[in-house]
Amino acid sequence: MTSGQADIVSQGTSHKTFFERYFELLDGQDPHRSLELVADDLEFSIQWAADGSRKSSQFVGGREELRGFIDAGDTDGWAHYVLHSRVSGNVEFALGETRWDNGERIGTFLAVAELDESGRMRRYMVARSPVLAFPG
């Protein structure tokens, strides 16, 4: 399964944005391939808002902790969809949704990444909430 996209702005270029490529790999057959886009000195924070099945939580760390987060995840039956994306220098922002395969929205996410000189993610912060939805 691959990530969807809508209304992407990438400073006038037609290539995929960083987050389109990252989520496509993360949602694909081998989620660990997404680590190809991650710098060795990564720092990250993933924040999940509470829903009916879990309390609010935050996951932090480096590249190996992100690998562990990927290992613990269940990626079957859903994917990331980038709705809007902007780039400012070496920083990219993406607003998107996670959706079940049938198209039903699971939650909304806001992600930001600082990219190194090789285009790999060096800093990453993402927050996800099931409460708010934005127009695509």
Predicted regions mapped to residue ranges:
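Short charge-dense sequence patches
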Residues: T13-E24, S45, Q58-E64, G119
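Short, low-complexity N-terminal intrinsically disordered segments enriched in polar/charged residues
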Residues: M1-D40, P135-G136
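A beta-strand edge to alpha-helix "cap/lid" segment located at domain peripheries
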Residues: T2-S10, E64-G136
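A solvent-exposed, acidic/Ser-Thr-rich amphipathic alpha-helical stretch
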Residues: H32-L35, A39-V87
